Amino acid sequence: STRKESSAASDVYKRQPSPVGEGSVDAPLRLGEGAVYGLRAQGPWAPHQGHRFNPAKLLLDPYAREVVGRYGFDAQGREADLTLYLGHDPHDPTWPDERDNAAVALKARVPAAAPVFDWQDDRAPRVPPGRTVLYELHVKGATRLHPGIPPALQGTYAGLGHPALVSHLQALGVTTVSLMPVHARADEQRLQQQGLSNYWGYSSIAFLAPEPRYAQTPGQAGVQDEFKTLVRTLHRAGIEVVLDVVFNHSGETDELGPTLSLRGLANRLYYVLEPGDPSRYVNWTGCGNCLDLTQPRVVELVVAALRHWVREMHVDGFRFDLAPVLARSGGRYDACAPFFAALRADELLSRVKLIAEPWDIGPDGYQLGRFPPVSYTHLTLPTTPYV
């Protein structure tokens, strides 16, 4: 995609807010179903003030439901120059990098206007908390190690829904699987430089998009439908699906990391910056940055992502990685934080299982037992929360 008039953003964002706080966004005009696009944001380059706008860099829509491309690789699957993803000059981080990176940038694809997946009267199992037996697993690891999974399905969502693995879970008495991160991710630069990837997946870059590397069938419909089929299969077996979600940080890492999406769209809005030096990021996560959930726009994005996974993908709950980060204000943990208030107020999200990992590496970071309750109940709710 190339740069267009900024007023075109309303065509892309007619169902959700623009991701840009300060500055303006450029987006393609009149996008149809299946169109591939990226965003460019105009604004000041002033890292010392927290601004990192660089219109030479094509940016991923944070509301993308499918990510086209892979960080570190070109469209043909060949390794790309990682410095092309940097917003700053690789030799002097105080200056912007003026090289256009559209050829290798991560892009979004416009989803179909109407869902076509047949859920076949899918119903949420709604297992009461007191009877929940939760089994944490990794999509790739669990399906590669089980001897009953055909080789073609190993490492995939389809493999996780295979009868051999479903029967194994039932035999163990599992009522709820907790999937380690399945959001589309960006493997950290330092790992790629060593020929490695982030196996565990705690480096999300698109909160509404499933990770395509776990799909047997490529393409938007293939990835989405394969994940939905997995959920439908587990529900038929009476097993809930909970997602391990990473909203405490993004895969853009620290100030020397890539500019893939949020950093280039509105760095000062999306991230918690060091008060005395806004060119640097507060790092309560140990992963280089922290999302700023005191900002209404950031809470909107996270809530939209959660609602998408419940309404469209039929998941039954979430486990929040490093949950205290989601409730920090001025550096302190706040049980009345805006994000928790948004969860309690949301008719859909207050019905599902919500699990908090109770620590981060910030001050007073261990908060076990100090997370507020939500209005989750099994006595008055219907069997399906998808409407």
Place the predicted regions along the sequence by residue.
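Conserved alpha/beta catalytic core and glycan-binding cleft of carbohydrate-active enzymes
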Residues: 105, 314, 329-330, 334-379, ...
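Short alpha-helical segments and helix-capping/turn motifs at coil-helix boundaries
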Residues: 23-26, 115-122, 161-165, 338-342
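A general structural signal for short secondary-structure junctions and capping/turn motifs
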Residues: 28-31, 102, 124-128, 169, ...
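Substrate-binding/active-site clefts of carbohydrate-active enzymes
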Residues: 90-91, 101, 138-314, 319-345
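The feature marks proteins involved in alpha-glucan
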Residues: 20-22, 29-136, 145-152
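Single conserved hydrophobic/aromatic residue that forms the stacking wall/gate
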Residues: 1-16, 378, 383-387
